[in-house]
Amino acid sequence: MRGRVATTAVSLLLLTTAATLGSAGIAAPAAARCIAIGAYDPAASQWPQSIDRYGRIVGRRPAIVSYYHQWDATPFVASELWGAWDRGAVPMITWEPMSYEGRRFPLRAIARGRFDRYVRRTARAAAAWGRPVLLRFAHEMNGNWYPWGAGLDGNTPHRYKAAWRRVVRVFRRIGADNVRWVWTPYTNQFGGVPFERFYPGDRWVDWVGLDGFNWGYGGRSYSFKQLFGGSYWMLARISRRPMMIAEIGTMDRGKTHWISQALRRQLPRLRRIKALVWFNDGDNGVDLRFNGSQGALGAFRAAVRNGRYGATRQSLLGLSSDRRGC
């Protein structure tokens, strides 16, 4: 997401509407299972009980829990990983080659192996964890809001692909075969350079994904179909890997209708999308949460209780191993 800084503050997730929608139980498994629901809650890193709260309020446990880490330290933090795993979810780490302290990690230097020692240490930590984990390295590369973004610091699609392949190669040599690589550009609706130029190839990727947000800038609202439709078909052309929406959110205005249309009508038509992770936080002054109002939360709950959103961690991991549909 543009301009996001990872936070460890306790999230306000669901507190305003919990009293009203309160003690609903977890949805029972349904017969048709195709799409996994994932959660990003900034509190989950330090307070894994927020994942339990998500399940109680939404009515379905998340199959993916999303975390964000920069290159200041090894991202495979046992408390985070177990916090997700013990609750039936696979952890997904967005691994950002930048630093809170301003240290630079240029793509060209990554590709040449300058940071291999750090990458190897991270790969060993992943291998020691041993269980499957989704890893998003250097996401939204087709935009210009991250240091590895297109056109910044001499970055090119060629350099990006070389850096991606270098990192994956190091992990494979270490034996971190439990890592599933998730390549995630921003949608071509707003992403700047067409993302297909940055794709490193199916040999180097386990999942392909998209990030996209209905910010409401300029007073204009974009539907799910407008945000993701064209980019979905481009992904389908360049890769045979399973797809996910790795970040999604929408502004407050019209949120209830937007969520209902997206999850009930528009997303199910994009049949290769097997997971959706809602970015349940704010950014750039926009409240992107699905629970920003009781109406929006009600729409989200009603949509994801449908059996099509019942994919589990087990089905996800089988999917990303053998590339079959659900």
Model-found features: residue ranges?
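Boundary/entry segment of secreted carbohydrate-active catalytic domains
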Residues: A30-A73, L317-S321
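Glycoside hydrolase catalytic-domain groove-lining segments
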Residues: V77-E96, R203-G254
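Aromatic-lined carbohydrate-recognition surfaces of secreted/lumenal glycan-active proteins
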Residues: W164, V168-P194, R240-R253, W278-D281
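Substrate-binding cleft of secreted/luminal carbohydrate-active enzymes
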Residues: R33-P42, P242-C326
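Secretory targeting and sorting signals
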Residues: M1-P29
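Aromatic- and acid-rich polysaccharide-binding/catalytic face
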Residues: R60-Q70, F195-Y222, M244, F279-D281
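Acidic (Asp/Glu)-rich catalytic clusters
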Residues: I51-R60, T74-I93, R121-G130, F198-R203, ...
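Substrate-binding cleft of extracellular glycoside hydrolase catalytic domains
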Residues: V77-W183, F279, N291-S293, F300-V304, ...
